[in-house]
Every structure is written in structure tokens, then in C-alpha cells.
Design a protein with these regions (language model features):
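Short beta-strand segments in beta-sandwich/barrel cores
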Residues: 32, 55-60, 93-94
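Cyclic nucleotide-binding regulatory module and flanking cytosolic helices
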Residues: 1-33
Length: 181
């Protein structure tokens, strides 16, 4: 059964504000569905917000992976000059809006600010994940990554995965062998 746009958006907003549909009825209208094929890049417009319904994206600083974003997570394009690229690693379905559209709603309905602030906090949590990963000892990195991303090896090459984990390709190969993956 296909879920409606409102049901899909609800999965992102209900934990923040269970009454969002009644209190901010205009919110769903500013989100547009966008689909991406593997290898396709997100439009890198400052302040864009993507809610990932299906699929997985990679966030890269130049060519270095800094984050993987899964269905149920959001991606915010920084509102300043940056060197990030956001690339679909699988077939992806998103809902996209802009900071400008959210500001327009916020001008007459300040409840949008709370939603946006909460999504911004979640972005920081996503970024903190990689910092935590890099601070772990090498033996603990394997479980830390594959508990969150059990299927990641299906989407990224071995060398990229090692780079994301901050370990050598040889060590990753040994960890994979030891874990019988």
C-alpha cells in the first residue's frame, strides 16, 4: 500500500510535534517529491532540506566520505559556501524544500521554527557520529559502523569504506574476514 505524502512526512515530524498537521497545515505543501538514481547528485542549493523516504546517500568532502544518510534521516545542505557533494548510492526517494520556504511559513506560523531547530539538532547528531567513529580504537570501528549501516558494503567500494572508518584497506579486509562477512 502506497503511503500518502502526509503519512510519509509524518514519520519525520511526529516525534518533534505530533500535532504538526493541524498546527502547521501549510507545511506539507512546500515539500516536493524528488527521485534520484545511483550516482546522481543532489542539487547543492544552500539551505535545501531533503527528507529521505527511501534509499541511501553519501556525503563527501571533495572525495572523502563524511556521512551516509539512510531512509528516515534528513540531509541539510549548508547555508554557506562548502565543498560537500551529496550523491545517491541507491535508488532514492526524497521530499525537498528550501529554507526560504520554511521562513515564509515561519513569518506567520512560528511553530515551524521548532521543527526546523529540531531537524538542525539531528544534523549535528549525524555529524557527531563520524567524529565518534574516528575516535574509537580500530577494533571497535567495525561493529560501530555495521550496527548502524548493516548493508553499507552493498553501496560503497572497499577503499571508500576504509576511508570512512579511518582505517587502512588491509585492516578492513582483516576485520571483515574476522567477522565472517
Amino acid at each position: 500500500m502506497n503511503k500518502s505524502k502526509e503519512d510519509l512526512l509524518d514519520s519525520f515530524f511526529r516525534d518533534i510535534n505530533p500535532q504538526w498537521q493541524a498546527e502547521i497545515p501549510e507545511l506539507s505543501a512546500v515539500f516536493e517529491e524528488e527521485r534520484f538514481s545511483p550516482g546522481e547528485r543532489l542539487i547543492n542549493d544552500w539551505g535545501e532540506l531533503y527528507l529521505i523516504v527511501d534509499g541511501i546517500f553519501g556525503k563527501y568532502e571533495k572525495t572523502c566520505p563524511v556521512r551516509y544518510a539512510l531512509a528516515g534521516e534528513s540531509l541539510m545542505i549548508p547555508n554557506h559556501k562548502h565543498r560537500y557533494q551529496f550523491i545517491a548510492l541507491s535508488d532514492c526517494r526524497t521530499y525537498r524544500t528550501s529554507l526560504r520556504q520554511l521562513e515564509e511559513i515561519n513569518a506567520h506560523n512560528p511553530k515551524v521554527f521548532y521543527l526546523y531547530a529540531n531537524l538542525t539538532d539531528k544534523q549535528q547528531t549525524y555529524l557527531d557520529y563520524r567524529h565518534k567513529l574516528l575516535s574509537l580504537n580500530n577494533q571497535d570501528k567495525f561493529d560501530f559502523v555495521f550496527n548502524k549501516y548493516p548493508d553499507l558494503r552493498s553501496y560503497v567500494k572497499h577503499n571508500e569504506l576504509a576511508q570512512f572508518m579511518g582505517i587502512s584497506s588491509e585492516l578492513l579486509r582483516r576485520l571483515l574476514r574476522d567477522h565472517d562477512c
